[in-house]
Amino acid sequence: MKLQINSSWQERFLADPPREKDHRPPFRRDRGRILHSAAFRCLQAKTQIHAIGENDFYRTRLTHSLEVAQIGSSIVAQMKLIDSFISLAQQLKEDRAELQKQLKLILPSNDLIESLCFAHDIGHPPFGHGGEVALNYMMRHHGGFEGNAQTFRLLTKLEPYTPNAGMNLTRRTLLGVVKYPTILDRSSPQYHQGVIVDNVDSKYVKISAWKPGKGIFRDDLKMFEWLLEPLSENDRTLFGQYKKERTRPDEVLKTRYKSLDCSIMELADDIAYAVHDLEDAIVVGVVTFQQWQSAVEKLTECRSEWIVENVQSLSQKLFSELHYERKNAIGALVNYFITHVRWKINNGFSEPLLRYNAELPDEVIEVLTIFKHFVWEYVIKHVDTQRVEYKGQRMLTEMFQIFDSDPLRLLPRNTAMRWQKATETDRKRIICDYIAGMSDAYALRVYQQL
């Protein structure tokens, strides 16, 4: 087995040679562009969990992204170790040491994985799921809205590093942030079929009725097609394959495959969400020890021996009044997930970046799912979170309508100029871009001004 990465993955949409005496490799340049972008800085004013409120301890989307980057780098280090190849070597009937020697060559550098982790949330709008639903509803006849799609759009078009190619990042970096390689309006529920009635007052949109699909905006199809040019026709077709076909008009379709780099980033994001968001909620009292017992009952029945043996002591430490004990438990959990990451093969692909992924064994996924479900049930669905998101949802829908009614008067000058030059469909997207780029606090200030 001889693996080689196509040099096309280091290409940029626009020619962009390094400046004089700039000897940084391509992915370090990408990392710098993301790190110094306005969109990245804006994450410091976007709250990770709204139920936690104003507390010096709580995480923002910026600190969350930094922690995801640290976990991502640790996963890359884990995937260099011989033990991470055991399952793959058995499956392929190949020598572990030879697999290790070859596959280490295609792992992302720390610069690359940190770039993906820094960028993974920059397209998410203010007020979390409520903001996302609000913008998806307002864009329902114009391609929809979804946070991951907006991330791709920011990186490839909106961030003003170039006139029309966003940050002009390398192909491999862009491939790594694409979690759902399809077009959004294909994967979204078929609202137009009348299953979901389109006559509700926008201020009272039901969040479950306008959940967006997962994919890339059709407006950004040109950049998406350029991104996939190095792939064979078979790989492109397989890459966009859905997990299953739609059986109900209101069903969201999700794609089956991701790139190697994206699979690492997504695992890091899931671990941070499941463990660190739980830590925040415990510290400020959003969840109680009694509520946590519902998760403990499930964890004691898991197939993971380590979890079964340690769940009681971990629980005591998580809710201990001694801060160092809680941090010890959090560190142990993060280490547990990271050290179980292993290699996975996606048969059918010829491109190494798609053929190989990172994964967790089924018994560890079971544990991670219990943690994520607990955070969802007791933190994300907490009434305080839902009220803040609902308030934000109403604010964003109303702001969209106000800007749409008199854009040249009410939009900032640069945004108004872009709106004036755009087609009717593009005009809606420009208003959406402006609102999606706001922080929670800025959106509130603008709403109060209006």
Curated annotation (Swiss-Prot):
Gene Ontology biological process terms in this record: dGTP catabolic process
Domain HD intervals: 61-274
UniProt cross-references to InterPro entries, sorted A to Z: dGTPase (IPR006261), dGTPase-like (IPR050135), dNTPase_2 (IPR023023), HD/PDEase_dom (IPR003607), HD_domain (IPR006674), PHydrolase_assoc_dom (IPR026875)
GO MF terms held by the record: dGTPase activity
Pfam families attached to this UniProt entry: HD, HD_assoc
Disulfide bonds: none
Keyword tags: Hydrolase
Annotated TM spans: none
NCBIfam families referenced in this protein's UniProt entry, alphabetically: antiphage_dGTPase, dGTP_triPase, PRK05318.1
Family of the protein in this entry: Belongs to the dGTPase family. Type 2 subfamily.
UniProt-recorded name of the protein: Deoxyguanosinetriphosphate triphosphohydrolase-like protein
Native species: Histophilus somni (strain 2336)
